Amino acid sequence: MSLVTSLTYVLPHRLLSSLARALAYSDRPATKQWLIDTVTRKFGVDLSEAQEPDPRAYPTFNAFFTRALKPGARVPDADPAALLMPADGRISQLGPIENGRIFQAKGQSFTAAELLGDEAAAAPFNDGLFATVYLSPKDYHRVHMPWTGTLRETVHVPGRLFSVGPDAVRNVPRLFARNERLVCHFDTDFGPMASVMVGALLVSGVETVWSGVEIPRYGDRITRKDYRGKGIVLEKFAEMARFNYGSTVIVLLPPGVARLDGRLAAETSVRLGQALARRQ
């Protein structure tokens, strides 16, 4: 375990993330430009695909970080049976949900019920599939729909804000089931689908297209929002949410509806819109 990961056990997660949020939304020219230039240089951010390629044109660091792409920069897989990759990033893990458990790393796993905050909500995904995608600081930070779905419910599950980088994934037990997260439940033509937006250290927020800022929230109680009857339908490949810094999205699918794309494996670099799985 790295020193940084060890320190995250004792660091004041909330305070650091609140400070990161204040900096991310600062419109002071010197502050925002220093942040943009530092992150661009350190992580090799490529702005050539951005709708706004000039790093000095962004009013805040957050605007830079959640930047839109040029039209056509990402194209969905042409196969109508393809469920799409929800984001740019890297596959952390993917595979079957076995005995209700989701694989995190060697010797590490957690239950779908822990992740979703609800045994009943997890039941339809038993023996189904999961894919965990890590968005690094250099990546496009908007999350899109793998398949067309009608929003049924969101569940905010309070928790810690550990780093979700590779070393933390290997060493922090049940990491994704311990961090603060927003669970988005959708109804689709094949049944339920869940997209879980996992918060992390220095992540200053998670926003959805239907409700705005969802994370951070304060308190230690699970919060549910019922969207049944609201008619919020998001089409396949449509934007659903964005991270205000790098983090992780986990997609859950029920059993018997799809096969994962055979070219994918842990550590594979992926792009929004490529095939994640194909309907059976």
From Swiss-Prot:
Cofactor dependence: pyruvate
InterPro entries in UniProt: PS_Dcarbxylase, PSD-B, PSD_type1_pro
Pathway the protein contributes to: Phospholipid metabolism; phosphatidylethanolamine biosynthesis; phosphatidylethanolamine from CDP-diacylglycerol: step 2/2
Active site per database record: D88 (charge relay system), H144 (charge relay system), S247 (charge relay system), S247 (schiff-base intermediate with substrate)
Protein keywords: Cell membrane, Decarboxylase, Lipid biosynthesis, Lipid metabolism, Lyase, Membrane, Phospholipid biosynthesis, Phospholipid metabolism, Pyruvate, Zymogen
Molecular functions per Gene Ontology: phosphatidylserine decarboxylase activity
EC code: 4.1.1.65
Cofactor note: Binds 1 pyruvoyl group covalently per subunit.
Site positions for Cleavage (non-hydrolytic): G246, S247
UniProt superkingdom: Bacteria
Keyword Lipid metabolism belongs to the record: yes
Family: Belongs to the phosphatidylserine decarboxylase family. PSD-B subfamily. Prokaryotic type I sub-subfamily.
Protein name: Phosphatidylserine decarboxylase proenzyme
Organism: Xanthomonas euvesicatoria pv. vesicatoria (strain 85-10)
